[in-house]
Amino acid sequence: MLEKIRRADGLILGSPVYLGDISAGLRALYERLVFQYITYKTEVRSYNERKIPVVLIVTSNVPAEYDAELLNRYKGTLEAFVGPVQTLASGNTLQVSSYERYNWTMFNAEEKKARRESVFPGERQAAFRLGANMIKE
């Protein structure tokens, strides 16, 4: 997979945020993707001679602004070793269709459903535009 990514014109990464971080699967890919380019030299940090654009998208149950620090941390490293990064966070997501079924009383199911209907379509469109713009560049 790493060789296919090296030959690609761009890379789109996406993950839910679990316990304040990206999923274990994406974290494993991220580590292998970055580690292959580390030089351990002060004068040249990366062996990557062909940078590609990256889009990093996360979803979570908390408001999107809570994911800003997480995204910035990954963005900085990806930009240093893979290429320029654009990010998008979709927060306060609808986890299940029926919160009552699970007795999850800490969530306001109606607010989450309303957000999914009013805000999420715009976020989906924004994600689409990020990918479309990457292709144009």
Label the model's feature ranges.
Residues 1-81:
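Helix-loop-strand module that forms the ligand-binding subsite of alpha/beta enzymes
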Residues 75-137:
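Glycine-rich phosphate/pyrophosphate-binding loop and the adjoining helix
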